[in-house]
C-alpha cells in the first residue's frame, strides 16, 4: 500500500487517542513520517468495539520504531477539573483501568440520583426533571445509548407542551443550546460537557459489565449534577 507523505506538516495532534486502531496509527505514522506526534486520550473512554488498549505502549513503540528513536516524552494529566467530587466518586467505580485514576479538584455538589421512571413522553419524570433543571443549570442534556431512543422521545414530545423545550442532536447536527434541553445519543455526547446530565435507560440490558466504558463516558459528561433513570431492572453498575 502506498502513502503520500506530508512533509510540510511538522506536528500532528491526535485527540481521543484511545479510539484508533494500530492499523490507523500505522497509516498516520507513514503519512506524517517527519512530523512530531502528540497523543491525547483517556483509556477509560474507549467506545470503539474493535479497540481495547490497556496502555499506550503499543502505539508509542510503533511511532518510535518508524522514526528510529528510542524514547518519548509522556506526560500524564493527573487532575480532573470537570466534575464534582460526588460525580467523580461515582464514575471511579466504573473505570475499567484504575491505574489511570485522576486526582480530583475538591468541588462538591449534588449527590448522584438513581431514579425509577416507568412513564414515557410528557409524563416521564426524566422529562419533567430536565425541564426543571433548565431553571437551575446553564446546560442540560439527556443522553440515550442509541439514536433510536432519541427519536422515540422526539416523537413522543412532538405535540406536547414540552416540544419547545428540547433540542435534538441525532443525525450529526451541530446545534448547541443553553436555552433548551439537549437530547443526544452517547456517541454524539462524547467529548462534550454539561452542567446537568440525565442518563436514560440505565437498565441492566443497556449498561452492564460489557458496556461499562460506555456508561462511564455518559456519566462523566456531567459537571455539576448527574441523574440516572431506569424503568425496570436497574443496571448493576448503579447499585
Ranges and model annotations:
Residues 3-7, 11, 18-239:
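Conserved helicase motor core of SF1/SF2 NTP-dependent helicases
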